[in-house]
Amino acid sequence: MAKKDYYEILGVSREADEREIKKAYKRLAMKYHPDRNQGDKEAEDKFKEIKEAYEILTDAQKRAAYDQYGHAAFEQGGMGGGGGGFGGGADFSDIFGDVFGDIFGGGRRQRAARGADLRYNMDLTLEEAVRGVTKEIRIPTLAECDVCHGSGAKKGSEPITCPTCHGAGQVQMRQGFFTVQQPCPHCHGRGTIIKDPCNKCHGHGRIEKSKTLSVKIPAGVDTGDRIRLAGEGEAGENGAPAGDLYVQVQVKAHPIFEREDNNLFCEVPINFAMAALGGEIEVPTLDGRVNLKIPAETQTGKMFRMRGRGVKSVRGGAQGDLLCRVVVETPVNLNDKQKQLLRELEESFGGPASDKNSPRSKRFFDGVKKFFDDLTR
């Protein structure tokens, strides 16, 4: 089945900048995150699809390859999958160069491959994301063999020059009227072979190993942010540089607050008496409780801004705000006395659409009356 266009998956144009892509990813990731859709296989697949699109389109090199060649750009090297908490990566820098080199005879001795990049998906609470945290993670990886130190050869020996290509890493083959160069089938393009392989890594130069890392998450990170740990990916072949580890941040849904950029939003219920008469209530912030003054005659939906009570930007600068949206709660489970008091209060208003006490209701019912009057003319 044909893969869906990455831009369509995120709902952005092909000209979208990184900020637009990140914003789209955050919105969709929150919607389809497995924590919010437990047991929903379709949502889980959609979440993986969104993550894959985000990882390609926020990497300048991979995005350029995708824009030019589409999904075919990643079919040879394979990209790190989005499943689970851990995934492998690939270096795409030489995919097309190697193809054209083989065709036109421009092949060369294959260099020792840099280690693959790794990805670790880290879930954070909102509090951890806002304040910053240091976490220990354990990752499986390929590490340099501690016996042969990456050479692949038994201790006391060294790799020898390949007798087939004489160290060139390439052999010439005739195809019709053309002579082309291809990687040596004996040494696989390395130019050397291991006659006496290391007993521990069996000539690979690397061994499977788990390692524990301490990762410092800076204050202010958000869903979609990525932290790079240089050299903490898989070990390279034959002493080549190691890849990098990318920690991908995902902030869990919070029971009270919602975050948008550096602002926090929360919904604050008040009873109708306080809405009418005004008063003071305690509202939560990430730094503790603070008092919020409610003016008399406050309506449902009124938004109160508490400056500097939001999230401090991870890149420095001003701190966001906390925006509290008031919701007037209708009382329930009334006793007889309370019901009687409310009836008396309603009578004192002069009906449900009093011009003085309920101007919005008055305007609404006047509009309804005019609407029906116009229909009957």
From Swiss-Prot:
| InterPro entries (UniProt xref) | DnaJ, DnaJ_C, DnaJ_domain, DnaJ_domain_CS, HSP40/DnaJ_pept-bd, HSP_DnaJ_Cys-rich_dom, HSP_DnaJ_Cys-rich_dom_sf, J_dom_sf
Q: Zinc fingers (CR-type) span which residues?
A: 132-210
J domain location, by residue?
5-70
Q: Name the major location.
A: cytoplasm
Q: Which protein are we looking at?
A: Chaperone protein DnaJ
Residues engaged in binding Zn(2+) 2: C162, C165, C184, C187
Spans of the CXXCXGXG motif repeats are 145-152, 162-169, 184-191, 198-205
Q: Would you identify the family this protein belongs to, as annotated?
A: Belongs to the DnaJ family.
Q: Which gene encodes it?
A: dnaJ
Q: Which cofactor does it need?
A: Zn(2+)
Share the domain note from the entry: The J domain is necessary and sufficient to stimulate DnaK ATPase activity. Zinc center 1 plays an important role in the autonomous, DnaK-independent chaperone activity of DnaJ. Zinc center 2 is essential for interaction with DnaK and for DnaJ activity.
Which UniProt key words apply to this protein?
Chaperone, Cytoplasm, DNA replication, Metal-binding, Repeat, Stress response, Zinc, Zinc-finger
User: Which source organism?
Assistant: Edwardsiella ictaluri (strain 93-146)
Its assembly, as annotated, is:
Homodimer.
A Pfam family recorded for this sequence: DnaJ_C
The free-text cofactor remark is: Binds 2 Zn(2+) ions per monomer.
Q: Name one GO molecular function term.
A: ATP binding
- On whether Chaperone is a keyword of this UniProt record, the answer is yes
Instruction: Give any single GO term for biological process.
Output: DNA replication
